[in-house]
């Protein structure tokens, strides 16, 4: 019998003790410190640090990092996100070169690149993504690239600019169920997210697409399964499902911890819907095991 996922309201309450399956190792090790020093020295930002990712120690010690473009100040105030908010600096068009140099210095064969939202200049933001892909391929031939993009406020030109650079994987996160969008995803729209994922396939049917959903914000089983079906209808290839962890008391409250068995149930249900790969677990984040996810789709390297 499938485990019952219980709906709990969004009222703040004293959090339950963190279960053992959510206790990640403290970040340490030579590779961790080397990557941190490199990012500082090249004036680069990583979402691993800005979003307080629990997997930072594991990933950085394997020389895997998700570089964050367009500065470290986001123009939106999403209730779940730990990335700082504010008025950003002008777009830095030298950033793609520095990210590519870091990728080459680290000897990465798979790079993940994301960004803050830049609602002040969606086309400029897309150009930085495209230039970063191109610079990485120039400075580290053979390196595959995954991009985790914002919704560009539905701007089709921006999406086309990124797709023209032919990333191996195009990721745009759904984050939560439609009912919780207003409280959790400031400035975003559920239908806009579905449209972006659908348009990516319409523009380039061969493009591998990916999206992620958090659980623990007050959603129900039925709502989650409805979202997975919606995403499958957009021909999304890869789905990630992970536990929401509240960054601070100023962020959206977490309603409960999901068990490993519940994550397995969600993976099994989603796989029945036609996804090529589903990564589902308490510590799963968008870029966690991204290289392995890419391999599972059997997607050959895109050449340009």
From Swiss-Prot:
Membrane-crossing segments per the record: none
Annotated [4Fe-4S] cluster 1 binding sites: 48, 53, 59, 287
Co-factor(s): [4Fe-4S] cluster
InterPro entries: Aldolase_TIM, Elp3/MiaA/NifB-like_rSAM, LIAS_N, Lipoyl_synth, rSAM
EC number, as in UniProt: 2.8.1.8
Localization per record: Cytoplasm
Region (Disordered): 1-21
SUPFAM superfamilies recorded: Radical SAM enzymes
Gene Ontology, cellular component aspect: cytoplasm
Pathway where it operates: Protein modification; protein lipoylation via endogenous pathway; protein N(6)-(lipoyl)lysine from octanoyl-[acyl-carrier-protein]: step 2/2
Chain ranges of the Radical SAM core domain: 60-276
GO terms of molecular function: 4 iron, 4 sulfur cluster binding; lipoate synthase activity; metal ion binding
Chain residues that bind [4Fe-4S] cluster 2: 74, 78, 81
Protein keywords: 4Fe-4S, Cytoplasm, Iron, Iron-sulfur, Metal-binding, S-adenosyl-L-methionine, Transferase
PROSITE patterns attached to this UniProt entry: RADICAL_SAM
Cofactor descriptive note: Binds 2 [4Fe-4S] clusters per subunit. One cluster is coordinated with 3 cysteines and an exchangeable S-adenosyl-L-methionine.
Superkingdom field: Bacteria
Reactions performed catalytically: [[Fe-S] cluster scaffold protein carrying a second [4Fe-4S](2+) cluster] + N(6)-octanoyl-L-lysyl-[protein] + 2 oxidized [2Fe-2S]-[ferredoxin] + 2 S-adenosyl-L-methionine + 4 H(+) = [[Fe-S] cluster scaffold protein] + N(6)-[(R)-dihydrolipoyl]-L-lysyl-[protein] + 4 Fe(3+) + 2 hydrogen sulfide + 2 5'-deoxyadenosine + 2 L-methionine + 2 reduced [2Fe-2S]-[ferredoxin]
Family in the record: Belongs to the radical SAM superfamily. Lipoyl synthase family.
PANTHER family: LIPOYL SYNTHASE, LIPOYL SYNTHASE, MITOCHONDRIAL
Protein name: Lipoyl synthase
Organism of this sequence: Koribacter versatilis (strain Ellin345)
Taxonomy of the source species: Bacteria, Pseudomonadati, Acidobacteriota, Terriglobia, Terriglobales
